[in-house]
Design a protein with these regions (language model features):
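Conserved beta-strand in the GNAT
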Residues: 2, 8-25
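Active-site beta-strand termini and strand-to-loop segments that position acidic
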Residues: 4-6, 87-88
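Conserved catalytic loop/helix region of short-chain dehydrogenase/reductase
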Residues: 25, 29, 143
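Conserved acetyl-CoA pyrophosphate-binding loop and the N-cap/start of the following alpha-helix
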Residues: 30, 34-42, 121
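Conserved GNAT acetyl-CoA-binding A-motif
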Residues: 47-60
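Nucleotidyltransferase catalytic core that binds NTPs
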Residues: 59, 67-72, 77-170
Length: 170
């Protein structure tokens, strides 16, 4: 998304992909005009209309204050480099807390898969991994950038692992 001046020159921009906001910039000659807030508000609205309610971004440390003032909260910081932020005050911490609720004794393992589509090979991989640990955490890539939509892939995976009681789907 971009904003233009009277001469049709881009003076502010920002973009979004999946549940992230990115690439914000405001021309130095137009800073202080509220363009950042207009771009951010527009992109958050776009994301909400898409159903992306939990948003993430990373930014330079010097720019984090602008996002903080607009309702974003720090998740992590790389000193001197960047800040990772979200639009929920304790969203990431709550996610980590919920993960501890699934903690079990014994060996735990994790798999991350796209499953585009979920095949017998994927099922064999999950079964083999599950047989070698007490608890297997299975994470399915949720980005809808492939031929098979996430909702279909999720359904196929859940059906394909339903006989495995030690697999926790995330």
């Amino acid at each position: 998304c971009a904003m233009y001046d009277e001469e049709h020159q881009i003076v502010a921009t920002g973009s979004c992909f999946a549940n992230t906001l990115r690439c914000f910039a405001v021309s130095s000659s137009h800073q202080g005009e509220g363009l950042f807030n207009q771009i951010l508000t527009h992109l958050v609205d776009v994301q909400y209309r898409r159903g992306n309610l939990h948003l993430f971004l990373y930014t330079k440390i010097d720019s984090a204050k602008f996002f903080r003032d607009s309702g974003f909260y720090e998740i992590a910081k790389v000193d001197g480099s960047l800040v990772f932020m979200e639009n929920r005050k304790n969203g990431f911490q709550e996610y980590l807390t919920n993960l501890t609720k699934t903690k079990t004794d014994g060996l735990s393992a994790a798999l991350v898969m796209n499953a585009n589509p979920f095949t017998l090979g994927h099922q064999y991989l999950v079964e083999t991994a599950a047989s070698q640990c007490h608890t297997l955490h299975l994470f399915l890539v949720s980005e809808d950038v492939s031929l098979i939509p996430f909702s279909v892939r999720k359904k196929l995976v859940l059906e394909g692992i339903s006989h495995l009681p030690n697999v926790i789907f995330h």
